[in-house]
């Protein structure tokens, strides 16, 4: 469900903008947003297994495509009015909008190779890049060159594929390739429009947009990764992470200092290729990764195993390669792979699938190939840091363990860290004078950071629970904000919360992590 919500994020806004631009007469911009919405629906359809839901979304897609065709026809009429009357061809034949294909210029028609087998007449060869050669048209299609008076839908790119075998398979290939090409064209146009929108909204910290820096064969995958995993402003600072001073120092040395002192980190002092953070759940590993990206000002890629999963053969490996290419384009950048044990566990197991093994191999190649010595055009270094987090470090493949050169243990918070975390959690609420933070910290020994946060949240809500106890629904609705928020958090609230919230980490889990640290730790 998380992947479905991500694939539909912003769909309503895209459709709203598309219709607003169409009403204003900006048909080109409207078509771009319509194409983006159709691409999102196509991605969502790939995640659906329910036939009823797929049928509903197919009807939605069909309605949007019909609306897009209307906008394209309006744009064609507008362009026709702008053209000079003398520029129209004499006796131009009417354009059949119901045709299964749109005519191409004469120099883009394919021909059969001499001596070779006859090509399928329903499947066209890819166009040649040699614009100087003139090739004869297909029989019966002479004189169908497009004029400037034709609409944009008639002058747009046609759906062509390479040679395929006769039968239904060739038609399916033609449709899938056409959808990919139209989606690519829509994303290219949307990228130029999004630069202006981002600068107005102020999403980028420095006011500059780096979209369009990726140059590679997988622009569709790059656009998908930009939308799903790119987070340029995580917004977490060192002060938001309580304790963990040793982990902060190591991460600062591995990630932040090479950006501040690039001339020092040369040769044997080169930055680390990868850092693995392991420890019990809820100790702040993900929060530390976001703080690293914020403090050193790098672009943050938050990756999970679901992001790199695909049902198509070879697609997951391409996504891994495209992710690292995109990270180099956005350098300096940080690739954070959460729960890496689910993506790259030990190879050679009896239940391991072939596709999973290929993804692991590609990830190992890319992590090993991360070069921190390349530079941009302005001379700045292209630093790509791989950060990984796991609760099961003993399940990680040993080859990946070698590539993650720094392996940092993130333990449960100690007494001072628990005090700092309680103060951080309570900084937005009013605290009564009888609250003893040190006593609460002593009584929560063995609690993880998430457990402490749950204790503070539960304690801060006890005042509201006392206020609404015994009241009807209408009485609760009529209560003012001051009536609810006036009660400060008291010590009795913490005592009740500690009784209800138990620690989620067992001592046996801590022993296993400490044993692995003594064997493979590299702090």
From Swiss-Prot:
It catalyses: n ATP + n H2O + a microtubule = n ADP + n phosphate + (n+1) alpha/beta tubulin heterodimers. Its EC number is 5.6.1.1. ATP binds at residues 279-286. It comes from the Eukaryota. PROSITE patterns: AAA. One of its GO terms (cellular component) is microtubule cytoskeleton. Expressed ubiquitously, including siliques, flowers, leaves, stems and roots. Residues 178-194 have a biased composition (Low complexity). Keywords: ATP-binding, Cytoplasm, Cytoskeleton, Isomerase, Microtubule, Nucleotide-binding. Residues 82-215 are annotated as: Disordered. One of its GO terms (biological process) is leaf pavement cell development. GO terms for molecular function: ATP binding; ATP hydrolysis activity; microtubule binding; microtubule severing ATPase activity. It is found in: Cytoplasm, Cytoskeleton. InterPro entries: AAA+_ATPase, AAA_lid_3, ATPase_AAA_core, ATPase_AAA_CS, KATNA1, KATNA1_MIT, MT-severing_AAA_ATPase, P-loop_NTPase. Its main location: cytoplasm. Disruption phenotype: Severe dwarf phenotype, with small and round dark-green rosette leaves as well as wide and short petioles. The ipga1-2 ktn1-4 and an-t1 ktn1-4 double mutants have an enhanced phenotype of pavement cells, resembling soap bubbles and no lobe formation. Pfam families: AAA, AAA_lid_3, KATNA1_MIT. HAMAP family: Katanin_p60_A1. May homooligomerize. Component of KTN80-KTN1 complexes composed of a hexamer of KTN1-KTN80 heterodimers that sense microtubule (MT) geometry to confer precise MT severing. Interacts directly with KTN80.1, KTN80.2, KTN80.3 and KTN80.4. Can interact with KTN80.1. May interact with the kinesin related protein KIN14A. Interacts with microtubule polymers. Binds to IPGA1. Severs microtubules in vitro in an ATP-dependent manner. Required for oligomerization of functional KTN80-KTN1 complexes that catalyze microtubule severing. This activity may promote rapid reorganization of cellular microtubule arrays. May be required for reorientation of cortical microtubule arrays during cellular elongation. Failure to correctly orient these arrays drastically compromises fiber length, cell wall thickness and mechanical strength. May also be required for the spatial organization of developmental cues within the root. This is Katanin p60 ATPase-containing subunit A1. It comes from Arabidopsis thaliana (Mouse-ear cress).
């Amino acid at each position: 469900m998380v992947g479905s919500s991500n694939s539909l994020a912003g769909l309503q806004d895209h459709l709203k903008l598309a219709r607003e631009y169409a009403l204003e007469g900006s048909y080109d911009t409207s078509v771009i947003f319509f194409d983006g919405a159709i691409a999102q629906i196509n991605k969502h359809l790939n995640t659906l297994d329910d036939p009823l839901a797929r049928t509903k979304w197919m009807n939605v897609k069909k309605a949007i495509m019909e609306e897009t065709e209307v906008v394209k026809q309006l744009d064609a009429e507008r362009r026709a009015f702008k053209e000079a009357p003398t520029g129209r061809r004499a006796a131009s034949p009417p354009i059949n909008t119901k045709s299964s294909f749109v005519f191409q210029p004469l120099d883009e028609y394919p021909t059969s190779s001499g001596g070779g087998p006859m090509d399928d007449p329903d499947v066209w060869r890819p166009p040649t890049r040699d614009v100087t050669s003139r090739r004869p048209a297909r029989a019966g299609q002479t004189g169908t060159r497009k004029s400037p008076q034709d609409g944009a839908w008639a002058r747009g790119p046609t759906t062509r594929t390479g040679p395929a075998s006769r039968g239904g398979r060739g038609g399916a290939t033609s449709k899938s390739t056409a959808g990919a090409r139209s989606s690519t064209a829509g994303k290219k146009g949307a990228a130029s429009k999004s630069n202006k929108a981002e600068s107005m909204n102020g999403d980028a910290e420095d006011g500059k947009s780096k979209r369009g820096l990726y140059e590679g064969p997988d622009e569709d995958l790059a656009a998908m990764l930009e939308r799903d995993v790119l987070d340029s402003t995580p917004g977490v600072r060192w002060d938001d992470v309580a304790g963990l001073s040793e982990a902060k120092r190591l991460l600062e040395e591995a990630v932040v200092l090479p950006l501040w002192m690039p001339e020092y980190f040369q040769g044997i002092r080169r930055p680390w290729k990868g850092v693995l953070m392991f420890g019990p759940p809820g100790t702040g590993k993900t929060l530390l990764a976001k703080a690293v990206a914020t403090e050193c000002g790098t672009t943050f890629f938050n990756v999970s195993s679901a992001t790199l999963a695909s049902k198509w053969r070879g697609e997951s490996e391409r996504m891994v390669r495209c992710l690292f290419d995109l990270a180099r384009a956005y350098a300096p950048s940080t690739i954070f792979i959460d729960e890496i044990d689910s993506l790259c566990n030990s190879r050679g197991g009896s239940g391991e699938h072939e596709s999973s093994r290929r993804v692991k191999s590609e990830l190992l190649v890319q992590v090993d190939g991360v070069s921190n010595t390349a530079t941009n055009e302005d001379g700045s270094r292209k630093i790509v840091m791989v950060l990984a987090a796991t609760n099961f470090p003993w399940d990680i493949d040993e080859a990946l363990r070698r590539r993650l050169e720094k392996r940092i243990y993130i333990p449960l918070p100690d007494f001072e860290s628990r005090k700092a975390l309680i103060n951080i959690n309570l900084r937005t609420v009013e605290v009564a004078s009888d609250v003893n933070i040190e006593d609460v910290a002593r009584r929560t020994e063995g609690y993880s950071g998430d457990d402490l946060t749950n204790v503070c949240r539960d304690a801060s809500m006890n005042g509201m629970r006392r206020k609404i106890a015994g009241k009807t629904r209408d009485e609760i609705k009529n209560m003012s904000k001051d009536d609810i928020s006036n009660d400060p958090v008291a010590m009795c609230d913490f005592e009740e919360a500690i009784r209800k919230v138990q620690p989620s980490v067992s001592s046996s889990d801590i022993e296993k992590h400490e044993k692995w640290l003594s064997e493979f730790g590299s702090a």
